Amino acid sequence: MSIETLVNDYKVKTTRSRQMYEEALQVMPGGNSRTTTFFDPYPFYIARGAGPRIWDADGTERLDFNGNYTSLILGHAHASVVEAVTEQATRGMSFPGPSEHEVKLAESLTKRLPSMEAVRFVNSGTEATMNAVRAARAFTGRSKIAKFEGAYHGTHDGVLVSVSPDPAKSGSRKRPKPVAYSAGVPDTVLKHTVVLPWNDADACAKILEKQGRDLAALIVDPLMANAGLLVPQLGFLERLREVTDRLGIMLIFDEVISFRVSEGGAQQRFGIRPDLTTLGKIIGGGLAVGAFGGRSEVMNAYDPRGGKGKISHGGTFNANPVTMAGGVATMKELTPEAYAKLDALGDRLRAGVTRVLAKSKQPAQVTGLGSLFWIHWTKKRLSDYRSSRPTEAERPLRTFLGLLNDGVLLTQRGLGCCSLAMTDADVDRFVETFGRVVAKDGG
């Protein structure tokens, strides 16, 4: 089905969203506040959500496999989270000091993550990675950081490098060149950033050993979520841990997305103990949140007692009590049984999508782990950013719009997730709908 036909169908279904978009354009560039949620001809505006479903401004119901970009692990408006948030809101929305919920959430996270000996809260994953990088620089006395080509770690300047670069302009596969992701990123940031190729342990080791004396940290998304959910090859993360240990480089695990794959995140699943960890998304129950923590001797730089704190850490809404209450309620729901259900839903969905693709004989595949999945429109082996980068940008968009018009929400690039609010029937509906979309698009 052509993109024009899909767009026309979308316009017919979203007349109120179009009106709201035109109103929004008068006061906001692009009509909203998140680049990721925009798509042509305009984004649909969401009125409410409940369980695994959302309803847009036109009243259209959709099954939500986006989950606010993987953050709603319990689904929308989970009863225990709503109760906790409402109860706290009646006692106060924000305070000029800490609260009991902050302590309880910190205790829950440090129990789940043994590497996180101490933790502090912020308001987003971006703030979490920004502070983790700062802590690593303060502890090591070094200025450079290393990251992987294709990895996303938030929107602060220090990590907006080689997020989705054009391979023709970013050096060789084994020695990627740092490329600014956005206008406004200073050249000095590029000079302080070393870029590595995912899943190439030997190439990474060579680069790290050459730059080691200047590197404060290596920041890693263990699932490379931005590049297509590329599970690390056997021994790859272990090699990174060995090399960074030997060279005195802080290993930061960015688990803003990957924390949903087990009680102890990807570090538990893969058996790696990082020096620092960043969290966000699921730990706030749907409210704005971030956290960073790790080795106590590193985190001590944030301890203000006796004037010994090396790093000032402020934020009017850090550890907001309403957010903390939602986080505590969410963590209570994330039991071993809950993760077993999430894994089963993810396995069922990936198996179903694989069957659809095999029947269609179209060049595509699905990657992922636990409750996360990503549909790629290529059959080539996916190992790093360059191999997973789409060669045809329109095909993922056609899939997104086809699903959207048929009552299922994914992300525009193909990333999706299951929530605890879902059932096998919800997953089967996704697979059936995906099958119809593929069949209409040449399959």
What positions do the PLM features span?
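Conserved N-terminal phosphate-binding loop of PLP-dependent enzymes in the Aspartate aminotransferase
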Residues: 1-443
